[in-house]
């Protein structure tokens, strides 16, 4: 069945041949230990040293694309990997006349598996590698792909593994931070404090926070870090309290596993969200966070959920299960590959085409790849209001001039 959502937006972007639309949705699984979809710092460690399994093919088109996923990794890795695989299959089935064959390889969640799977896919004629998911696996796959002069479109949100020819199609937390600080600054917030988790994710968002505040000529008045126990949270709030009267906003990117307890510590410490605006990231896009009293009225940035919800409905119907939150990434990657194969001829996966400044329209909104491999996304700003999540500033439909 040909679906109209692939066609309408192709007419709407500035570079029509390069636009592809993928209508996606939201589920409840994160791709890494941080709780941020797709943010990872390592691999699950299954099957060390084993080669990738030969896997199967999806589709029968002339253009071959490798799909490297942790299908039999330990724990959540396999759950996410199989959801990504299903989404890739769905994208191919829904794209009208897709001329692709996906060469599916199981990397078992290891760098060794990713290296072997990439080598196998390239031997079988892959022009593009989609995946892997985990950062160490991306590095291993990239090394092989680079020697064959083939690009990689990976799902890690660890910006350290992005480089020329290795494009991250993911949800980088830096994008969330930049968007919400930019919005707060535009609303007149000039001084910022931060209370960040003492984790790998916390380090990434703290650095992004400092950069975003500096870029807007604003002031950072204090930064405190907390670990997961209640005593650490209370101590961090206590250290922060003397600086809060100087702050217009408090950046507190805590996820559902810690935000309720941290919110209680903030309340007990006298924090008033009507005087200091709470700010967060996409980890706030969770009902358990939305109900925390201490951050009501707070703003955070996240992909618009309408596209994901549409995708999730179709996925549920097709596979009789809910997709993980990161499943949209594989759907968009395969839809994009199919669109470029149709419209761009022999240049379909060239650097110039993949880093097109107008970007692409996907399930989670508009995005584009930078020459350094990182991505920029059009994100919405949402507000926690009476325990609900409401949009206060819609995601842009156009990304504007490139930042790099």
Enumerate the predicted regions with their spans.
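Periplasmic-binding protein-like
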Residues: 121-133, 153-155, 191-196, 244-259, ...
């Amino acid at each position: 069945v040909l679906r109209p959502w692939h066609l309408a937006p192709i007419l709407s972007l500035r570079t029509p041949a390069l636009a592809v639309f993928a209508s996606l949705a939201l589920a409840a699984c994160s791709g890494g230990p941080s709780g941020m979809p797709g943010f990872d710092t390592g691999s699950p460690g299954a099957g060390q040293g084993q080669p990738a399994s030969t896997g199967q093919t999806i589709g029968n088109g002339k253009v071959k694309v490798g799909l490297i996923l942790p299908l039999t990794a330990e724990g959540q890795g396999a759950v996410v990997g199989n959801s990504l695989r299903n989404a890739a299959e769905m994208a191919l089935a829904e794209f009208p006349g897709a001329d692709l064959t996906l060469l599916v390889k199981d990397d078992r969640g290891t760098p060794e598996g990713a290296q072997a799977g990439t080598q196998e896919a390239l031997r079988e004629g892959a022009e593009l590698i989609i995946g892997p998911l985990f950062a160490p696996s991306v590095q291993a796959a990239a090394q092989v792909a680079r020697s064959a002069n083939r690009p990689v479109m990976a799902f890690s949100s660890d910006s350290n593994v992005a480089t020329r020819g290795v494009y991250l199609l993911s949800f980088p937390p830096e994008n969330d931070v930049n968007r919400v600080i930019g919005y707060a600054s535009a609303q007149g917030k000039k001084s910022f404090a931060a209370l960040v988790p003492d984790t790998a994710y916390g380090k990434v968002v703290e650095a992004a926070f400092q950069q975003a505040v500096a870029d807007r000529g604003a002031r950072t008045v204090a930064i405190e870090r907390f670990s997961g126990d209640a005593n650490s949270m209370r101590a961090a709030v206590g250290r922060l309290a003397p600086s809060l009267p100087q702050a217009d906003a408090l950046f507190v990117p805590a996820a559902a596993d810690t935000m309720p307890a941290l919110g209680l510590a903030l309340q007990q410490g006298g924090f008033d969200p009507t005087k200091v605006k709470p700010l967060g990231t996409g980890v706030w896009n969770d009902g358990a966070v939305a109900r925390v009293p201490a951050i009501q009225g707070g703003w955070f940035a996240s992909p618009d959920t309408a596209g994901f919800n549409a995708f999730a409905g179709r996925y549920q119907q097709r596979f009789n299960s809910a997709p993980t939150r990161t499943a949209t990434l594989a759907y968009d990657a395969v839809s994009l590959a199919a669109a470029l194969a149709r419209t761009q001829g022999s240049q379909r996966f060239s650097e110039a085409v993949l880093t097109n400044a107008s970007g692409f329209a996907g399930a989670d909104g508009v995005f584009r790849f930078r020459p350094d491999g990182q991505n920029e996304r059009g994100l919405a700003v949402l507000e926690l209001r009476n325990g609900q999540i409401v949009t206060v500033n819609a995601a842009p439909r156009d990304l504007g001039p490139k930042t790099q």
